[in-house]
Amino acid sequence: METLTKPTDTRLRRFTETGTVYPILFMISITHLLNDMMQSVIPAVYPLLKEKFGFTFAQIGIITLVFQMTSSLLQPFIGLYADRHPRPYSLAAGMCFTLLGLFTLSVAPGFVPILLAVGLIGCGSSVFHPESSRVAQLASGGRKGLAQSIFQVGGNAGGAMGPLLAALVVIPFGQASIGWFALAAILAILIL
């Protein structure tokens, strides 16, 4: 049984009883695109990090482990909390973690700061996904499959765009250019 505890949830529920709220679905899909695009930059810049810092494949694996642990294993716990205490502003808060992580990654001087950076990006994703899924479901107007599909298209498109943008921006211009991806986080915060 779903309980709505926040006035914003009640207003959204009333609004969605009349049908699917496409503007909200498209907004949440666009922010999902931006979120997953920023995440997918991380593995795309592994060759740059390996070359610049002389990392071993084990160190690259540890970077991946930290990112995956924070971006995926935290999600169920955050989702459980979000179900009990809906906080739509947590979407923007998650993007702030990602923003901070991208800036940190763009200036990180070595292995430990890079671990911190990818951990922050992963935490941002863990905070974003459960609440954004909940918002997509609330905006579905009962068309949950359609709503989830629109939401997922954004994430998949973003995951495909990130490596391409990394190849066009980061590889030619270096580690500092990762900071430009923070603009995507700022845009997502403004949309949210």
Ranges and model annotations:
Residues 73-112:
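Conserved MFS/SLC helix-loop-helix module at the cytosolic interface between two early adjacent transmembrane helices
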Residues 117-154:
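Cytoplasmic helix-loop-helix junction between adjacent transmembrane helices
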Residues 28, 112-118:
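Short hydrophobic/alpha-helical segments at membrane-entry points of transmembrane helices
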Residues 2-31, 35:
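Cytosolic juxtamembrane N-terminal segment immediately preceding the first transmembrane helix
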Residues 151-192:
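Helix-loop-helix hairpin linking two adjacent transmembrane segments in secondary transporters
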Residues 40, 68-76, 159-160:
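Residue-level signature of mid-helix packing/kink "hotspots" within the transmembrane helices
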Residues 27-47, 55-57, 78:
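Extracytoplasmic
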